[in-house]
Amino acid sequence: MPKVMGIVNVTPDSFSDGSQHANLTSALKHCELLLKQGTHILDIGGESTRPGAQPVSLEEELQRVVPVVKEAVRLNVPISVDTYKPQVMQAALDAGADIINDIWALRQKGALDVVSKHTGCGVCLMHMHAQPQDMQMHPMEGLAIPAVIAFLQERAQALMERGVSKERIALDPGVGFGKTVAQNFELLAHQNQLSSLGYPLLVGWSRKSSLGAVTGCEVAERLVPSVAAALLAVERGAQVVRVHDVEATVQALTIWQFARSSTSTLRE
């Protein structure tokens, strides 16, 4: 079955659940809850990357993320850290993290070095047009798929030239990161072209504004649209879906997997 990556935002200002898990105790409780709900990976982030979000200092992000990683590794589930800062990457890996999930696709100075020098961590390279502060004010122009494919291929190649094996790399088309509603759904409709590149595909539609644009639902009301988008992403080749609502997504994927199984003997 495709993997579910559960989101743990250790931030006061995330667009969906800001401040709910902004301290060590509440963050760990949320990690434990997501694990009980069936998450396969925990994705811990200490800086909001919602449209318009302001950067946080290196010191603040380290204080938010590293203590949670050190405790979460005891849960015996793969730990991903959502960061673009090389110093946070290194500290997280030293604390026991397994995956670096970078919205900048290792374009920050020193990021390629951190990941390439680590012997075993996984890395997810995401496409983002512009930067969080202004990416939705100036979204990309034209068709998204060709630009996203070219960018992700270039970033993956840069990493492999540093000696990182292809098996350690996953790609993320970056839904909602500098793209229009039409471009986001273009990425979903033609996601098979990304899957054909031969890398595991990680996709995050959870509670995104494009879902609200189509359905009229506010952020807190986007459970059903989020699960529907996750299922469509999986149907089109995503191996990992990054979500807030782990339990509902796991249940939906269980039904999806069961329906596809030719070995099922269950009868109504």
Predicted feature residues:
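Catalytic domains of carbohydrate-active enzymes, especially glycoside hydrolases
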Residues: 29-45, 237
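Active-site-adjacent loop and "lid" segments of alpha/beta metabolic enzymes
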Residues: 15-30, 49-67, 71, 75-78, ...
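Extreme N-terminal starter segment of soluble prokaryotic enzymes
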Residues: 1-4
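Short acidic capping loops at alpha-helix termini that bridge into adjacent secondary structure
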Residues: 166-168
